[in-house]
Each structure stands twice: as C-alpha cells, then as structure tokens.
C-alpha cells in the first residue's frame, strides 16, 4: 500500500548506492527495515559487488541483518559455499545469523545433498542451528521427511520448536 510507494519510487529513480544511503538514514522501525531489505535485494541483483561492499560496511550496525540476508541469498543461489565463507567472516550476531540462514536456504534450493554434507561437518553451535533452520525451511518443499529430521536435530530447544512448527506448517500446505 502507501508504505511501499516511497520505497519503490526511491529504488526506481536512484542508483543502488543512493537508495542504500537513503534507506540507512531512515528512522529505525518498520519502514526502515522494509527499505533496507528491499534495497539490498534490488542492489544484489543489479550490482552484486557493490551490494556486498555495502553489506560489509553496515555489518556491525543495528539492522544489518536486513542487508546481509538478501545479499547472501542472492550469492547462495550461484555459489553457496563462497557465500557461507563470507558470512562466517562477518561479526557475530544477528546479521551473521541472517546470512547463515539465507545461505543454507539458498543452498538447499540449489544442491540439497552438498548442503547437508556441509551441515553434517559443521561443529555444534548456534550458527549450525541457524543454518539447519534455513536449510529445513527450504528442504520441506522437496523432501518433508528429511526436513523434519534435520529440524529435529537443532540443539536449541526454542529454535528447534520454531523450526519444527514452520516445517510442519509448510508440509501441511504442500
């Protein structure tokens, strides 16, 4: 509705970097979150290297997960392992988690066998739990049983319950 009009207009008439700067300086809240993620998504498709630089430059800022997620998702659709290496080098926290989720979600769509090998070799950690969550959310559309098994292997109770609920819902809709 009205909310999206200024964001769409801004993305359409600006260079990606102008749109990124504009989105970054909005007041924190829903509009800024939407602007950041939509700009990042647009930017990653138009000029990936510049989008990646922007993502790195904001990676320790509040709201960085809105940029890291879409940029990683775009990259993971082409080269998931490189995307995951990059995400691993980011500062720990919400942005890194968002990237991890997006990388494995994209990887599950591209090559689920390679993605599950990668997950199997990750040490147990919060990052692995996030990775499994992203992976199982996507895997459910191809292989719901395997997605349930993976989601059930998450070692954090809260995250495991969330993942199982989401996978179960998607499975029911399939």
What do these predicted regions represent?
Residues 1-174:
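Non-catalytic tandem-repeat scaffold regions and their flanking low-complexity/translocation tails
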């Amino acid at each position: 509705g009205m909310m999206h009009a200024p964001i769409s207009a801004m993305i359409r008439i600006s260079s990606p970097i102008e749109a990124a700067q504009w989105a970054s300086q909005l007041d924190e809240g829903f509009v800024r979150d939407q602007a950041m993620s939509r700009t990042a998504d647009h930017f990653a498709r138009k000029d990936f290297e510049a989008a990646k630089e922007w993502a790195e430059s904001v990676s320790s800022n509040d709201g960085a997960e809105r940029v890291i997620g879409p940029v990683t998702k775009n990259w993971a659709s082409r080269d998931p392992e490189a995307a995951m290496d990059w995400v691993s080098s980011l500062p720990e926290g919400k942005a890194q988690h968002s990237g991890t989720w997006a990388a494995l979600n994209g990887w599950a769509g591209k090559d689920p066998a390679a993605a599950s090998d990668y997950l199997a070799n990750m040490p147990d950690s919060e990052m692995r739990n996030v990775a499994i969550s992203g992976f199982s959310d996507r895997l459910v559309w191809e292989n719901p049983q395997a997605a349930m098994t993976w989601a059930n292997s998450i070692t954090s109770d809260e995250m495991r319950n969330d993942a199982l609920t989401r996978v179960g819902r998607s499975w029911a809709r399939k």
